[in-house]
Curated annotation (Swiss-Prot):
Comp. bias (Basic residues): 468-477
The keyword Phosphoprotein is assigned to this record: yes
Identification of the protein by name: Ankyrin repeat domain-containing protein SOWAHC
Compositionally skewed regions (Gly residues) per UniProt: 230-241
Gene source species: Homo sapiens (Human)
Stretches with biased composition (Low complexity): 101-112, 242-251
The organism's place on the tree of life at top rank: Eukaryota
Residues modified to Phosphoserine: S88, S126, S213, S226
Keywords noted in UniProt: ANK repeat, Phosphoprotein, Repeat
Length: 525
């Protein structure tokens, strides 16, 4: 008959032949190797070859599945697990098919292929029907399929919809043969753990110094500055005297440059916390260990220990720091500036610490005329509730109180508001010659100093205290006003009145005057 002759080459093709071929290779073989092995049964005429190939594909799909290894893109034919479990396979090594994963590890050349069959037998909970009828071009289900590796046999069960739960549970023989991506994730995880372990210390310090004020975050290290400083100081000195020398030598450079290095050693870190806390108990141990910390500036705010003491209003601490500097012969600048240009007197005036202001000006002769980078003196930060003696002490008499004195003098205008830019003022260095005729004018001119009225009673009270620094040179000078056109006088005023005053040579301004008219006063004559 024509049928047996036509199907003669396909007679050798059967489930047993394919099953035997895969079982001999551990349940897994290259697709090209399988096709090459049965190529003799797939030849013949084109029509016969097409039927033989279709028949061969059906046989392979009946007993195995085709998968692509993502590592190299090679196609592998895997034996289905029901054929791996059954003991009725015609040939091959039965123990090799039925044993578990542990005894299969030391097998010979067929060991890697046999291990690839075991996930199907060891994972019965996975769906057996998935990927069963795969063709040659069917996409792979698992994420990783390294060839001939022990990790691949566990990955075969990743035909399930949820591949991730099986990844973190490797078997005892998978510790040295993890897939490449798994290794990268593990390394990345370990590096992240290592980075987070090193980060808190530096970030803690940065949070302490980068806030609005370091004392707001003292809760990170409350009361523990002294123990930390002793241990940190011991560690810094253990490395040599270079650390201590660098702290002292960098103070002068930081004073001029305005900041130091962001990285602090433990001793400097403890100093920052103790200085911002403003307690002598914690500062004493650090200053004894390293006296140069007394004049060291914070690299963010530019504060020294003196600035912190003035800010907190602790005059006892301020006196102790100055005495400590004198005892150790340290040059201390009581007028040292912060990063914003503030002196200790500025900070004490800002926060209303009157006793600190008295100590700085009276005992340590702080300069009351220094202005910060905003152009303000310390007296301009005093609140209105501060006593008048304290304002006179810091030089507020000539700055802000002239307005109130002028306001009590019958509604006079301040010269700075009256005089326009084209009126020139001259300072006379000689005394007034005709004191009799111009006595009244002389007296009124002395009452104005730099455009502000002086209070005679305030002068007497200030001189009794001995703390005022009056500007005597301004008192000696007189102010001469040169009238130029246009004039301040009302253009509608009759000429007779102006003639009586002796200033008839001035001509009225025609039209509307661009300057504000002022009331008459004895200052201008």
């Amino acid at each position: 008959m024509e049928g047996p002759a036509e199907w003669g080459p396909e007679a050798a093709l059967g489930p047993e032949a394919v099953l035997r071929f895969l079982a001999e290779r551990g349940g897994r073989a290259l697709h090209a190797e399988l096709v090459q092995h049965f190529r003799g049964a797939l030849g013949g005429e084109p029509e016969q070859r097409a039927r033989a190939r279709a028949h061969f594909k059906e046989l392979v799909n009946a007993v195995a599945t085709v998968r692509v290894d993502p590592a190299d893109g090679a196609k592998y034919v895997h034996l289905k697990k029901r054929f791996c479990e059954g003991p009725s396979e015609p040939s091959g090594d039965p123990p090799r098919i039925q044993v578990t994963a542990e005894p299969e590890a030391p097998d010979g050349p067929a060991g890697p292929e046999a291990r690839d069959r075991l996930p199907d037998a060891a994972a019965p909970e996975s769906l057996p029907g998935q990927g069963r009828e795969l063709g040659e071009g069917e996409p792979p289900a698992p994420a990783h399929w390294p060839p001939l590796s022990a990790g691949a046999r566990r990955k075969n069960s990743r035909r399930d919809v949820q591949p991730l739960p099986r990844t973190p549970a490797p078997g005892p023989s998978e510790d040295l043969e993890l897939p490449p991506h798994g290794c990268e994730e593990a390394d990345r995880g370990s590096s992240l753990v290592g980075a987070t372990a090193q980060r808190p210390a530096r970030q803690n310090l940065r949070d302490l110094v980068m806030g609005s004020s370091p004392q707001l975050k003292r809760s990170v290290c409350p009361g523990g500055s002294s123990p930390g400083s002793s241990s940190g100081g011991g560690r810094g000195r253990g490395g040599g005297d270079s650390d201590s020398a660098s702290v002292a030598s960098s103070s002068a450079e930081e004073e001029s440059s305005g900041g130091g290095s962001v990285t602090l050693d433990p001793l400097e870190h403890a100093w920052m916390l103790s200085a911002s806390d403003g307690k002598w108990d914690s500062l004493e141990g650090l200053l004894t260990c390293e006296p140069g910390l007394l004049v060291k500036r914070d690299f963010i705010t530019g504060f020294t220990c003196l600035h912190w003491a003035a800010k907190h209003g602790r005059q006892e601490l301020l006196a102790m720091l100055v005495n400590f500097a004198n005892k150790h012969q340290l040059p201390v600048n009581i007028d040292a500036r912060t990063s914003g240009g503030y002196t200790a007197l500025h900070l004490a005036a800002m926060h209303g610490h009157v006793e600190v202001v008295k100590l700085l000006v009276g005992a340590y002769d702080a300069d009351v005329d220094i202005r910060d980078y905003s152009g303000k003196k310390a007296s301009q930060y005093l609140s209105r509730s501060i006593a008048e003696e304290i304002k006179n002490l810091v030089g507020a008499l000539d700055e802000g109180d002239g307005e109130s004195a002028a306001g009590s003098g019958g509604g006079r205008w301040r010269l700075s508001k009256v005089l326009p830019s084209h009126l020139i003022t001259y300072k006379l260095s000689h005394a007034l010659e005709d004191g009799g005729d111009h006595h009244h004018h002389h007296h009124s001119a002395e009452g104005w100093v730099g455009g502000k009225a002086k209070d005679p009673g305030r002068k007497a009270s200030g001189s009794s205290s001995g703390r005022i620094k009056p500007r005597l040179n301004k008192i000696r000078f007189r102010t001469q006003i040169v009238h130029t056109t246009p004039s301040f006088r009302d253009p509608e005023q009759p000429l007779e009145g102006r003639g009586e005053e002796g200033v008839g040579e001035e001509r009225p301004v025609k039209g509307h005057s661009p300057f504000t008219l002022r009331p008459k006063s004895n200052v201008f004559g």
